[in-house]
Amino acid sequence: MAKRTLFGTDGVRGTANREPMTADTALRIGMAAGHLLRNGDHRHTVVIGKDTRLSGYMLEPALAAGFISVGMDVVLLGPLPTPAVAMLTRSLRADLGVMITASHNPFQDNGIKLFGPDGYKLSDDQEATIEALLDNGLEGHRAGPTALGKARRLDDCNGRYVEFVKSTFPRGRRLEGLRIVVDCAHGAAYRVAPKVLWELGATIVPIGVTPDGTNINKDCGSLHSRVMCETVVREGADLGVALDGDADRVVLCDEKGALVDGDQLLALIGRNWKRAGTLQGGGVVATVMSNLGLERFLKDEGLALARTPVGDRYVVEHMRAEGYNLGGEQSGHIVMSDFGTTGDGLMAALQVLSALVAEDRPASEVLDVFTPLPQLLRNVRVAGHDPRAILADPQVARAVSAGEGRLNGGGRLLIRKSGTEPLIRVMAEGEDEALVAQVVGDICAVIETASQ
């Protein structure tokens, strides 16, 4: 497999109007991806969705121009969640799906995620092939004047996704009597998420639903959940739901304002699906970041926890290869392959709401599935330095080895570079919270010194 340099763990990402997030590079990515995925004799189609970032107005037409120039028709969806783009790629029998988003990042960033005709994210090999096409020139792949593609907008895409998500909620159940705070992060779900919950009968308190192009994820959404938690308590709500900018991840909070992460959601859904006889694969797929408490809980339930590298695409790849139908990340990506091909925050929230309705107990009881071990994650910014070189630094290596020795088999230590930002992430967990904090602090200090 050729080495990827443009694509990270979740597509291409960077600062808007700076390489690689320029109109020129977006056009060339469209040409290369269109050439790669343009298979068969039928009329070729690509669907393009986006979140609410200002730079989407620049990248959307650039990508469309690239696809049109290699003979592909373009269907423009406008602001719509990432899982909706994956769903519509399959529904419209498109050759390719594109989501313009930088997910949970601030508005200054943007990115490009690519989906194949089956609705799954492209493989590492396919992304490497696209990079090779970019490097080797695209002149020979342009369509002739009469073979250019066309572009049109799909007017009812929001309604299609709303009905699709609602179809995953058990028939006969309604959300009447539940008061739900939904934080859409001023992002891609600002129209569809409140609509789904309202149509299922809930009383909704929407926040983060007034995007202006620059406020996506700003002090709101799944990474900044304080406002949601405070609003739940103030409004006397039964549950809070916070999505990120492209709505492929979710975190919740109970009626007391306590935050509930993806590990608890995996535990709840996995246990319930096991009892219902619908869980496949004998367990759940998660990443190396998931809490050891989740692993112990699943073991007590007679279920396995399969771990993958960080990134929902790797979770999905393992699920497909080994026959699992539930996986996700602590950050709130929850993948349920019975319903979809990628993480879907809104769909995951409905699984939890279904449990609330069925059990008729407060969220604080239903969502307290297991007790997590003390876990601490810190990010060290290393802009301008190669994270791999820093991690290979002898002083850093000694600090990591010393940390592992101090945990002495009673916990886990994980140090890795981010696939989407110039960060090194340091995570430790164990029974002794004070020791965990010391280990993380010492390693971060050495990394900061090495990156100066």
UniProtKB/Swiss-Prot annotation:
Cofactor, how bound (note): Binds 1 Mg(2+) ion per subunit.
Residues bearing PTM Phosphoserine: 103
GO molecular function, one term: phosphoglucosamine mutase activity
PTM per Swiss-Prot/TrEMBL: Activated by phosphorylation.
One Gene Ontology cellular component: cytosol
Domain of life assignment: Bacteria
GO biological process: carbohydrate metabolic process; peptidoglycan biosynthetic process; UDP-N-acetylglucosamine biosynthetic process
Pfam families the record matches: PGM_PMM_I, PGM_PMM_II, PGM_PMM_III, PGM_PMM_IV
Active site positions, chain numbering: 103 (phosphoserine intermediate)
Keywords: Isomerase, Magnesium, Metal-binding, Phosphoprotein
Cofactor dependency: Mg(2+)
Sites where the protein binds Mg(2+): 103, 244, 246, 248
Catalytic activity: alpha-D-glucosamine 1-phosphate = D-glucosamine 6-phosphate
Listed EC numbers: 5.4.2.10
InterPro entries: A-D-PHexomutase_a/b/a-I, A-D-PHexomutase_a/b/a-I/II/III, A-D-PHexomutase_a/b/a-II, A-D-PHexomutase_a/b/a-III, A-D-PHexomutase_C, A-D-PHexomutase_C_sf, A-D-PHexomutase_CS, Alpha-D-phosphohexomutase_SF
Keyword Zinc in annotation: no
Family stated for the protein in its record: Belongs to the phosphohexose mutase family.
Role played: Catalyzes the conversion of glucosamine-6-phosphate to glucosamine-1-phosphate.
PANTHER family registered for this protein in UniProt: PHOSPHOGLUCOMUTASE (ALPHA-D-GLUCOSE-1,6-BISPHOSPHATE-DEPENDENT), PHOSPHOHEXOSE MUTASE
Official protein name in the record: Phosphoglucosamine mutase
Record organism: Rhodospirillum rubrum (strain ATCC 11170 / ATH 1.1.1 / DSM 467 / LMG 4362 / NCIMB 8255 / S1)
Organismal lineage: Bacteria, Pseudomonadati, Pseudomonadota, Alphaproteobacteria, Rhodospirillales
